[in-house]
Amino acid sequence: INWKKIAEVGGKILSSL
């Protein structure tokens, strides 16, 4: 599991809300 990738994608999702 690539936690850095998950965090990056998660951050983009949160910033788009």
UniProtKB/Swiss-Prot annotation:
Task: Please classify the protein's predominant subcellular localization into one broad category.
Answer: secreted
Residue ranges spanning the membrane: these are none
Location relative to the cell: Secreted
Q: In which tissues is it expressed?
A: Expressed by the venom gland. This peptide is also found on female cuticle and nest paper. The venom could be the source of these peptides, which could be spread all over the cuticle by the frequent grooming movements of the female wasps.
Mind telling me which GO cellular component terms the entry cites? extracellular region
Which parts of the sequence carry Leucine amide?
17
GO biological process terms, alphabetically, are:
defense response to bacterium; innate immune response
Establish whether keyword Secreted is in the entry.
yes
UniProt keyword terms in alphabetical order: Amidation, Antibiotic, Antimicrobial, Immunity, Innate immunity, Secreted
Role: Shows antimicrobial activity against the Gram-positive bacteria B.subtilis ATCC 6633 (MIC=2 ug/ml), and the Gram-negative bacteria E.coli JM109 (MIC=8 ug/ml).
Write out the similarity annotation. Answer: Belongs to the MCD family. Mastoparan subfamily.
- Name by which UniProt lists this protein: Dominulin-A
Organism equals Polistes dominula (European paper wasp)
